[in-house]
Amino acid sequence: MILPSEKSATDVAAQCFLNALIRETKDWQLAEYPPDELIIPLDEQKSLHFRVAYFSPTQHHRFAFPAHLVTASGSYPVDFTTLSRLIIDKLRHQLFLPVPLCETFHQRVLESYAHTQQTIDARHDWAILREKALNFGEAEQALLTGHAFHPAPKSHEPFNRQEAERYLPDMAPHFPLRWFSVDKTQIAGESLHLNLQQRLTRFAAENAPQLLNELSDNQWLFPLHPWQGEYLL
């Protein structure tokens, strides 16, 4: 889609996609003259231009969006759906990739992009997350954009929209674990300092003490994420 406005803005989801591409490929260049731009050629007649806000020695580059599609007839601002489609189509032709594979990949990229924006819109506290020390759970819930070098860091397949809002850490949900009574012969694992039975018993005592009477030497309490529990049942 060609955009009617050229208002410059930060787009962290698009930035993750672009930084992953820059890290994994070499078919791009920096403009030799101001303004500072990253140029990705599409073919002999078209290229994508990205205004560089900061080019990082650690590859955490920042860009001002929208990107521009430059052709023989002019320069046009384009949205993320269009620029990601153009880049994926280019790679498909270059690498002879199957069309269905590329379509699935593009769909995941767009879902991740949309989810990132939904998360930021829903988390009204995101602007103050760096103003205080966070515990482990809070830190996990503060990862609103995901991996900085990933084309689809917030893809959440196979969750649907309702499940994503209920369970994904970036939505800051709270929910209880599902507990199962499992024969010890069906459980295998290791634990530091404690044996597996001791570790599971301690975890149950800390999180579901009301279930401790279900324990026996042969039946152990085993916790699962509620989505995993529903899936197995």
Each PLM stretch: what is its role?
Residues 1-233:
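Nucleotide/phosphate-binding site architecture used for ATP/NTP-dependent chemistry
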